[in-house]
Design a protein with these regions (language model features):
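Short beta-strand scaffold segments in enzyme catalytic cores
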Residues: 4-11
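An acidic intrinsically disordered interaction segment
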Residues: 23-35
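ATP-binding/phosphotransfer module of carbohydrate and carboxylate kinases, centering on a glycine-rich
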Residues: 9, 34, 38-189
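A short alpha->loop->secondary-structure connector
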Residues: 14-26
């Protein structure tokens, strides 16, 4: 997650890795509990259809914070940013901001677990984007992995999927540049 939510699949078994782009960030948000259904209803009133990207991007952190602000009768500043919410949680210990990041991690983990069940990436599931490196401490706190593994009878299968956090925020851009370079080589060969 970053400004949006991108999803791709990589087949790295051959000599030349193949990348399959998707629009996976635009699948429907799938609430995991009653509280998340309330979040879905809240965002449905604002946006109509609610994709998972409405939660898992910078604006998504703000959306969750907005919902929790209304739920707990706190004033909501419509100008607040995801970075400010993260700072409130990480540096100032603000309980609403901390709860926002907990919700974000649970939703992120559940979505990643759904992707893992769909694609079975036994070589690893890689988390990238602008937000992931900024929330490494939150990733380590367990909410993400707990939600990732909360898949009923399929939970044991997901124990075989390693999850990696990529700290380089430019990895997507570097991959696109590499792809472009390879395409140029093929065109001139």
């Amino acid at each position: 997650p970053g400004t949006g939510l991108g999803v791709c699949l990589v087949d790295g078994k051959s000599d030349h890795s193949r990348v399959f782009a998707t629009e996976g960030g635009h699948v429907d948000f799938s609430p995991a509990n009653q509280e998340q259904f309330e979040l879905l209803r809240f965002l449905n009133r604002i946006y109509g259809r609610v994709s998972i990207e409405r939660m898992l991007c910078g604006k998504g952190i703000v959306n969750i914070y907005h919902f929790l602000s209304e739920r707990y009768h706190h004033a909501f500043d419509p100008e607040i940013t995801a970075a400010e919410i993260s700072a409130l949680a990480q540096k100032e210990g603000d309980s609403l901001a901390k709860q926002t990041l907990t919700w974000f991690m649970r939703i992120y983990g559940a979505f990643a677990g759904n992707l893992a069940l769909t694609t079975l990436p036994f070589g690893g599931l890689y988390l990238a984007g602008g937000i992931t490196p900024k929330l490494l401490d939150e990733l380590k706190q367990g909410e993400f992995m707990q939600a990732f593994l909360y898949k009923g009878r399929m939970s044991r299968l997901l124990l075989n999927v390693p999850v990696y956090a990529i700290s380089d925020t430019k990895v997507g851009l570097q991959g696109a540049a590499m792809y472009g370079y390879k395409q140029l080589q093929l065109a001139t060969a």
